[in-house]
Amino acid sequence: MVITGTMRAVRKSESPIAVEVYTPQFLKKNPSPSIFESLQNVNGVRPQLNCSVCNTGDIHINGLEGPYTMVTIDGMPIVSSLASVYGLFGIPTQLIDRIEIVKGPASGLYGSEAIGGMINIITKSPEKAPVFTGNVMTTNWLEHTVDLGTKFKVGKKAVSLLGINYYNYLNPLDKNNDQFTDVTLQHRVSIFNKLSFKRKHNRVATLAGSYFTATRWGGAMR
């Protein structure tokens, strides 16, 4: 089932728009500190860093610039195209059920920001999510990533899905000896919470919120 092409759940074969679906298994095969880096392994999708000091960037689809790529969470445009990189950094990977990607114009449904395409991140259903998930990763550059997810009941009719992502890289390196940091130093924390409320006639209402903070430093080594 896919949602992105029609704004409602339909079979992938019945969607009027070609939708590519990537599951958590894809993310596990290509481990990275955030979804932003993971998407570089998708054909036609190119995350690009635009600043060597703060490492901010955007996502190009089929060669079109980042402002023409829409990023949504559960079909909702949480951030604008210009700030999409921060939206992708702020989603704990343990909460992702799948990623749906539309390449090419999707502006008929989602407006002018989706001329290049769109990336729709579908989070897990709180009712079906595991009680606890966790992932810890480190690299030989001393990058440290902790990703946690859990669910718990809130009262009699609500279930909360909570995810926390922590990233730390404070090891300045200059491999090419140009007196400029090769990778921006970062200290990043993101929290995502999704509440699911049971309603009559098997209907469900959801409420989601996120918190993101990051400190970045780059530039001259001295």
Put a short name on every predicted segment.
Residues 19, 27, 39, 99-101, ...:
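Non-catalytic regulatory/gating segments with a bias toward low-complexity or hydrophobic composition
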Residues 36-77, 97:
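Extracytoplasmic beta-strand/coil segments of soluble accessory domains associated
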